[in-house]
Amino acid sequence: MDGIKLLLSIIILYFYTYINCAIAEPNLIDQVVAIVNNDIILESELKILRDSIQNYAKLNYQEQLEDNQLNKHIIDRLIIKKIIQQQAKLSHITIAETKLNKIIHDLTSSQNLSIAKLRHLMYSNRNIYDIYRAQLRQDLLIAEVLNSALHRRITILPQEVEFLAKKIAIRKNTTFNLSHMLIPLPEKPSRKQKNEAEALALFLMAQSEKQNDFRELAIKYSTDTQMLNSFSMIGIQHTKLPLILAKHLYGAQKGSVIGPIYSDIGIHILKVHDMIRTHMSNIPITEVYARHILLRTSVKRNDNQARVQLLNIARKINIGDISFSIVAKQISEDIISSQQGGDLGWNALNAFTPTFRKLLLSLNKGQLSIPVRSSQGWHLIQLQNIRQVENTTNKEAAYRILWHRKLAEIAHIWIQEQRDLAYIKIINHHDNR
């Protein structure tokens, strides 16, 4: 799931849509602005994104691009989106209603908002709930395509994981004595206010190199219009700090002055007075080695047909007529694991959903499961081995960090490769392929 979250963040960089602009003006005569293989991009699509970006820039007091520059930028993003959607179609990748509903539920729950309330708010604001769902489905679809295409391109060496895991362990087991200063900003600061606050932050950082007491600095440089806030954090664990501050303390040393750190409420400065490291023991966790065959449902294969097909495959494997590995390579629709005969490798048991965890624990080594359904389709699973290992939380965190870094890098490369392979014609624009 972390991989999907990261990919969604990459997608947002490419396909940001301000939802209140998601309904095109009526009565427009659409024109084709670009051809991408056998698909087209319409002027209305361009206008929706152009309006959304311009409105976002106005709301956030950002400089706006010239129309020609902005149009070129948007068309490029729409071309990339179209190419990835075409890849999804070729690979028969879809987003199930159950998965979409779950993600909307998770997103709304995190904001203490029910789906019914979200729907009501959106219907009262230009009736855009359906458009919101469609946009989210497209973002998830793109994430699935990127995840499938890029997974096998990423190589993470064991020594990379070990090195980063040690750094994470040290930081997680560290408590800090910190001074914290906040230069507050209004909810929608002007560019002038931002520049003045940043200049003050840099000045205070220089002053704090000479003077330890942030409180005195805050009193000295506060004005009637801008009161600086300062307080101490003594013996606070790294894991208990707000994420926006904690991530800036990796690599910090005693005496470090860290900043400017930007947040929604202003600019933060930290000074590290002391760092205390403690030792924490590891608790063993369960890992499983499994392989699977995945059959997706489609207009040509319903749920019952997929389940029956897997039951027949399981029967033939059990009597020795066919090999699990060979049949996985031939028919499994998990394009990543199918190349390895369905092999999923070693994974922490808690990385699986509760249904799959229960299923895996019920199997003996070498035993096949009954066909089981997920949001991806129907699975036939074979447990190959199970073991207890030392807690690899830090290694898992290190692996995820490395994965995310490399994923972001190669996503851009892969997208450019797909663009180079596609037939692209921009109408009334220079073709920048």
Curated annotation (Swiss-Prot):
Assigned EC number: 5.2.1.8
Reaction it catalyzes: [protein]-peptidylproline (omega=180) = [protein]-peptidylproline (omega=0)
Gene Ontology cellular-component terms listed: outer membrane-bounded periplasmic space
Single GO MF annotation: unfolded protein binding
Signal peptide: 1-24
Keywords assigned: Chaperone, Isomerase, Periplasm, Repeat, Rotamase, Signal
Pfam families: Rotamase, SurA_N
Family matches, as InterPro entries: OMP_Chaperone_SurA (IPR050280), PPIase_dom_sf (IPR046357), PPIase_PpiC (IPR000297), PPIase_PpiC_CS (IPR023058), PPIase_SurA (IPR023034), SurA_N (IPR015391), Trigger_fact/SurA_dom_sf (IPR027304)
One example of a Gene Ontology biological process annotation: protein folding
Entry annotated with the keyword Iron: no
Transmembrane segments: none
Compartment(s): Periplasm
Ranges where the PpiC domain occurs: 173-274, 285-385
UniProt remark on domains: The PPIase activity resides only in the second parvulin domain. The N-terminal region and the C-terminal tail are necessary and sufficient for the chaperone activity of SurA. The PPIase activity is dispensable for SurA to function as a chaperone. The N-terminal region and the C-terminal tail are also required for porin recognition.
PANTHER family registered for this protein in UniProt: CHAPERONE SURA (PTHR47637:SF1)
Entry function: Chaperone involved in the correct folding and assembly of outer membrane proteins. Recognizes specific patterns of aromatic residues and the orientation of their side chains, which are found more frequently in integral outer membrane proteins. May act in both early periplasmic and late outer membrane-associated steps of protein maturation.
Identification of the protein by name: Chaperone SurA
Record gene name: surA
